Amino acid sequence: YRSSRGLGDVYKRQNLNSIRDSYDDSILTPPDLINECYERIEKDSKDKIWISLRKRSEAIKIAELVSISSRKNKPLWGIPFSVKDNIDVEGLATTAACPKYSYFPEKSSPVVQALENAGAICLGKTNLDQFATGLNGTRSPYGVCTSVFNDEYISGGSSSGSALSVAKKQVCFSIGTDTGGSGRIPAAMNLSL
């Protein structure tokens, strides 16, 4: 994949240092990178990675605000990430892959708030085995997450959407949970380590 501005080559590496260098050299801006992410998300829209996704326009507005803010003490300035949908993000429903459980939190969880304070940009909430009780990525009413390598194989779970959002380079990193392999298994099965 290569965008018209050639940003795809930078983002393919998905290396935070490369992205920071591209920001420093004015080759890339946070809104550019967010657009790249959404192009990848739209390209892979058949995959059941996302439960709730910020509107592109909203994410770009956040990226524009980040762009004009100081980078001092913000090691994740302009870096997009996703969050497993059992962790609260202000403005996005938390479902734990159970629609009847759905609620809108009043504020983001401390980990999400800390990442945003460090300059990171949350794009949305990812699919998981319902209530994070599974290790294969197939126990969600929002659809089955499949392997990044072959859609006839499972992705692993329960942090399946988190691992796939990174493996498919839709975001640079993701926050998941792990009690008995829920993060490690899908990360290993999809080379998201």
Language-model segments: residues:
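Single conserved hydrophobic/aromatic residue that forms the stacking wall/gate
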Residues: 1-11
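Gly/Ser-rich catalytic/binding loops embedded in alpha/beta enzyme cores
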Residues: 12-179
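A ligand-binding cleft/hinge motif common to bilobed small-molecule-binding domains
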Residues: 183
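Mobile "lid/hinge" segments at catalytic clefts and subdomain interfaces of large enzymes
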Residues: 189-192
